[in-house]
Amino acid sequence: MVPEVRVLSSLLGLALLWFPLDSHARARPDMFCLFHGKRYSPGESWHPYLEPQGLMYCLRCTCSEGAHVSCYRLHCPPVHCPQPVTEPQQCCPKCVEPHTPSGLRAPPKSCQHNGTMYQHGEIFSAHELFPSRLPNQCVLCSCTEGQIYCGLTTCPEPGCPAPLPLPDSCCQACKDEASEQSDEEDSVQSLHGVRHPQDPCSSDAGRKRGPGTPAPTGLSAPLSFIPRHFRPKGAGSTTVKIVLKEKHKKACVHGGKTYSHGEVWHPAFRAFGPLPCILCTCEDGRQDCQRVTCPTEYPCRHPEKVAGKCCKICPEDKADPGHSEISSTRCPKAPGRVLVHTSVSPSPDNLRRFALEHEASDLVEIYLWKLVKGIFHLTQIKKVRKQDFQKEAQHFRLLAGPHEGHWNVFLAQTLELKVTASPDKVTKT
C-alpha cells in the first residue's frame, strides 16, 4: 500500500506543477486559491480529485493565508490489532471492535462545512469563524460524530521567512522542522507529529518498540512538557466552541475589534486593562456581558489563584513561562490508548456527556458540555474509578478507541477552556 500512496503523491505533485497558475491568488482583496477550476478560501482544506483515481482520501490540500496551495499525505496512527480494516472514503485503517455484532453500530457521522465533507476524527482549519483573530492565531477544527468543534489557537513564531503548514495543525513551522515529518513508526513524535530526537521523555532512547507498543506522542503531555518551540503562548485568549448548523448571524464591534456571532471576549478599559471577571458574548450583533461565576468544585484539592485570571486553577494546569526545555527528571507517562464513550441515556438537548477511559489509569474522566446561547461550554470534568464507571456503563456507547493524542489535540493546544458554573454565566479557568 505504501508504494501506491507514493505513486499517488507523485501524481499530485505533477498535477500541481501542471497547473502552477491555479495555485496562486489573483489580486487582493479577492484572494483565493484556484485548484483544478474550483475556488478555495484561505484556510480551507480538501481532498484533491485526480483522474483516474478520483478523490484521494489519503491526501489533503490546504489554501494558505497567502493563497498558495500546499498538499500533504495524511499520517495514520498505529493500529494494534491483527486484521485492521479500511472503510470506503477513509484513509486510515482501524480495528474492528470484536464485542460489537456487525450491523448494530452505526458508522460515525461525517461533517460538512463550507461545502467540504470531513470524516469523523478529521482535523481542518476554518479561519472565517474568528474574523478578529490576531496575526499569530489560527482556527483548528475537528469533526466528531457529525459535529464540528473549533478552537482559536495561538501559534509560536516560526522564525523563518517562508514557513510551511504542519499536518493536523493550523500553525506553520520552518522547513527543517516541517520536513521532519517521519514516515517511520519508530520516530519520536511530539506535538503535531514533529520530530524532536533530543526529547529526554521519549520511550527508552535508541530502543525499538515492540509490535504492540503505542507510538510515543506529546499531544496528551502536560503543557509544561511541550517543547518550547511548540508551546502555546499565553498572550492569546483561547476559546473552544461548537459550530452549529444555523444561518449567518451579525457580528459585533467592541473596542475597535470585530467579533463573530457566538464569540466571547474579556472587555478592556484603559484605566483597568482587561477585566478577567467580565465576559462578553456576541449574539447576532448584540453584546451581552456577564460577570464570571467561578466553579464551586475543582478537579484538584488545592486550586491556586493566578494573576490575570478570574478563577483559581489547578497547579498541574499551569505552564512555567521560564521553562524553555523539557524536564530531564519529570517525564509524563506514555498516553497509550483511550476509549471514548458518549452518553446514550435520555438527557436534555443542551447537554453532552463524554467519558474517556484511559488504558494506563484506574480513573475514568467524564466531561459534561452544556449548550449556553448557541455555544457548548465545558461545565464539568469529573473523575471516577473504573469499577464505579462500569456500574453505569450501560448508559454510555463506545465511540472509538483512538490513540489518546488524537482526542487531546485541542486540550494540548488550549491554555484556557470556558467552564460554566450556571446556565447563564461563563467562566474562564
Swiss-Prot record:
* Domain VWFC: residue ranges: 31-96, 109-175, 250-315
- PTM entry text: Phosphorylated by FAM20C in the extracellular medium.
Tissue specificity here reads: Highly expressed in uterus. Moderately expressed in heart, liver, prostate, testis and ovary. Weakly expressed in skeletal muscle, kidney, spleen, small intestine and colon. Expressed in the secretory epithelial cells of uterine endometrium, fallopian tubes, endocervical glands, bladder and prostate, as well as the transitional epithelium of the urinary bladder, and in bone osteoblasts (at protein level). In normal cartilage, expression was confined in a few chondrocytes in the superficial zone as well as in the middle zone.
What keywords tag this UniProt record?
Chondrogenesis, Cytoplasm, Developmental protein, Differentiation, Glycoprotein, Osteogenesis, Phosphoprotein, Repeat, Secreted, Signal
Write down the glycosylated positions: 114
Say what the protein does.
May inhibit BMPs activity by blocking their interaction with their receptors. Has a negative regulator effect on the cartilage formation/regeneration from immature mesenchymal cells, by preventing or reducing the rate of matrix accumulation. Implicated in tumor angiogenesis. May play a role during myoblast and osteoblast differentiation, and maturation.
Q: Tell me the lineage of the source organism.
A: Eukaryota, Metazoa, Chordata, Craniata, Vertebrata
Assembly notes: Interacts with GDF5. May interact with BMP2, BMP4, BMP5, BMP6, BMP7 and INHBA.
Question: What protein name is recorded for this chain?
Answer: Chordin-like protein 2
Q: For the modification Phosphoserine, which residues carry it?
A: 182
Taxonomic source organism: Homo sapiens
Is Transferase set as a keyword in this record? no
Give the GO biological process terms: cartilage development; cell differentiation; negative regulation of BMP signaling pathway; ossification
Positions of region (Disordered): 182-224
